[in-house]
Amino acid sequence: CNAPAIPEAAARLPDDVASITAFDYKSPADVPAGGVLVVGASASGLQIAAELAGAGHPVTLAVGEHVRMPRTYRGRDIQHWLQETGRLDEGLDDVDDLVRVRNVPSPQLVGTEDRSTLDLNALTARGVELVGRFAGYNDGNAQFSGSLRNVCSLADLKLGRLLGQIDEWLDEHNPDTQPGERPAPTNVPDSPRLMINLERAGIASVVWATGYRPDYSWLDLPVFDRKGKLSHTGGVVDAAPGVYALGLTFLRRRSSSFIHGADADAADLTEHLTAWLKAGG
């Protein structure tokens, strides 16, 4: 039900610059020789940038709003603490702005055998150049926002708050846990480039790690809002009784889009469906 969300500017790239979505990318072998511009700095963008840099490609990463998160903290996987502290169980009534929460980028989390943290600092240490959010492409030039320092500072601030909440929970419930080591602030270049001429920079391909948009072309029902999104209340599609949704971001809980979070949502919606059927639905 999802399709890659690609900026309109992608259609203006010259024919000699490969345009690849994160969905189609499988390995560095999919990318021609030369420099690569990776657009998007959530988990997929970071992982692709790291792989390409490791394969010898000069890599530039366009960074917009992102959620920074370490793979491990205080001796355990960060997902363990999110579960233990109840953060993943937060529901619709626990957030002030549901629309904003549903549009927050996915965390910068990548699974590896050594459970190492892959973040912007790890990428710059590998030679990846950071620039701001991709803003467009005109006359051979890729353009970038000047907000890189601000978005990185905000991501660092939110990470500090999250780790502080975990520390407070541990102080109360398990004070003997080993102390936590906070990640260093994001190392932002002093003057990140705002424009790059792809030809002069030797950039031969662009990888769009810009997320996905819902594709409901198969669903012939009047159940969408003015932006084309499925209109529902906690997975209950009000405009079409008997129709339900599962797996959407923060459908009913913060964990709704995780495999381990779908079961609780499914139980709630099954209860709603059963009641509707008993009432004559």
Where is each model-derived feature located?
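Flavin (primarily FAD) cofactor-binding/catalytic cores of flavoenzymes
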Residues: 1-281
